[in-house]
Amino acid sequence: MNDNTIHETGPTAASEETAPCWRCGLAASLEANVCPHCSARLRSIAADPDQLVAGAHRHASGAVKAMLWAYGVLLPVGIIHALVMQFSVDAEVPFNEATRTRVYTQILIVEGIDSLIILGVLLFAPRPAPAPIPTPRTRIAAWTLLLPVLGGLLALNVGYHWVLRQLLRVPLITDELTAQIDILAIVALCVQPAVIEELFCRFYALDCLQEITSRHAAVWISAVMFGFMHVAMLPSIPYLIVIGAVFAYMRLASGTLLVPVIMHFVHNLVVSLMG
């Protein structure tokens, strides 16, 4: 990464110096603002050849700071939500219609707060560099694998939560929430998470993290962030981290956020109907 060697690129080699892009490692001009190979934003280093291309560029730093600020608010909101849920739902008392209405009201309030925070960041914060565009073959493979991968995740969900219910006897609030499926449940459990959570975790956060770390690290860090956004579903966090990573890889492979949005919505809908 510290190699600022002049690379021969043809007739213009004498006038054009290149250095490895911080993201993909391929040669990029020292004068370029965007990597021609992976679209990473680059920091001009013509004034100081000892610096690396696109090291800690101000725009990237602004996007990362906005992402961290947003998550720093989303996480406490989730923790407060979990604590209120813990004290407002008595496991010894039957989950009646009044309790269901109260819990769903709380969920919708929290989701409204989360939506305002995330949409505010998307509208007003700096944008991270876009993820590298996958090849047509990779995109086709991602769409082709959408249903098989989703089926595998649903099987993993059933197995994981069977262990929690039957072997570990862990009470799951989602069992009560999905006992009756109506428009309220579909909006709260399927629509809002599939749109808002994907916009933050698989779009903004994932691209921000790719500004400062490798692709695989960005995938798993964003997946952990996604998992802990669901503190109210504490026993499910390990599974949510796995599904978050799968959604992230599918977004990168397909080149579009639509794939994880579809997968997230269908996954939650099927799980809710099974409940």
Predicted regions, residues:
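Alpha-helical transmembrane segments in multi-pass membrane proteins
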Residues: K65-P126
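Functionally important transmembrane alpha-helices
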Residues: G78-L83, V219-A223, M229, P235-G275
